[in-house]
Amino acid sequence: IAENLKLGFLVKQPEEPWFQTEWKFADKAGKDLGFEVIKIAVPDGEKTLNAIDSLAASGAKGFVICTPDPKLGSAIAAKARGYDMKVIAVDDQFVNAKGKPMDTVPLVMMAATKIGERQGQELYKEMQKRGWDVKETAVMAITADELDTARRRTTGSMDALKAAGFPEKQIYKVPTKSNDIPGAFDAANSMLVQHPEVKHWLVVGMNDNTVLGGVRATEGQGFKAPDVIGIGINGVDAVSELSK
């Protein structure tokens, strides 16, 4: 009897609905096509390399991974080669020691730039709908440029705002230490104190949580809801936040 094909699916943040959805449909594909999916959480480098060892021990022939750190790419690819396992990167592209994308590893990701552009276009539309004076308005762009997909989204958003006619000199970028609400909140606070002249804020971020962190920071600095527009990317965390 042919033994059942096993494939791993490793994700960096299993608690995030995005990755839960990926796992759910991987399981569905496994049922439909007749293979077993071994799901493992890999929040850091050590757990990632250990997970590849345990996949090999269980007889898996390959794995899909959203790595906790793109710079682990060379180590992941080398380990996979050592076990003669196939590897596909999902969402975040591997980079080599020099920080250059590893094109040798197949990548499946969404159109991050296009999604970012849509965020920027909708922010501009909503600003016009509210009749804000552009001179009193600024963009707070909470960035995580070391993560390729995040950089594509926020750059796409800022490019779309500029293309619509928003002045580049009023787009302020601030890096976040982490892509969650506390990280974005701290980043946004550090920016808000530098620009007391701004009366209206457009908040750009790579996901719902970075945008929520930015919005909460404006709230803490006394801005009211009519003077802040934030558009998240994901449609998950913002939904639960707004239902409170």
Residue ranges and their predicted role:
Residues 1-244:
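A residue-level marker of the well-folded mature domains of exported/periplasmic proteins
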